[in-house]
Design a protein with these regions (language model features):
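Vicinal oxygen chelate
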Residues: 1-15, 23-24, 30-125, 132-135
Length: 135
């Protein structure tokens, strides 16, 4: 029997107000590969999904704010997010244009940074912020 690949030691887990739309955006904008999706049979929400961009795996689900202290909320419900992604690419301009065409909001246009090479900053339709960088 083949050994199952271990999960990463640390992976971001996103809460989204519309996880299906977020999955579609990440596929179109960042060529994310969907590894798996579990639909909650009680409510039809995406209870867990796994995606991969390059060598990074990350998770997402629909928000569940109604579950009290165990609840998870989307950036839309919280009025923002406390962190952002750093995505390293070969062509910042092309990656930025592709993400904007897929529905991202451009927060900072592509610029040259002394410490980080070329970079831009985007907000995806789910409210998560991304820095797209060449370094």
């Amino acid at each position: 029997m083949p050994k199952q690949k271990a999960r990463p030691s640390l992976a971001p887990y996103l809460s989204c107000s519309n996880a299906a739309a977020a999955l579609d955006f990440y596929r179109r904008a960042f060529d994310a590969a969907e590894v798996m999706r579990w639909i909650d049979p009680d409510n039809g929400k995406i209870g867990h999904a796994e995606l991969r961009i390059g060598d990074c795996r990350f998770y997402l689900a629909d928000e569940y704010p109604q579950t009290g202290e165990l609840g998870v909320c989307s950036p839309a419900s919280l009025g923002g997010s406390s962190f952002h992604f750093w995505l390293t690419v070969d062509d910042v301009e092309a990656a930025t244009d592709k993400a904007v065409a897929a529905g991202a909001t451009l927060l900072r246009p592509v610029e040259q940074s002394a410490q980080d090479g070329r970079r831009s900053r985007l907000r995806d339709p789910a409210g998560h912020v991304w820095t797209v960088s060449s370094h």
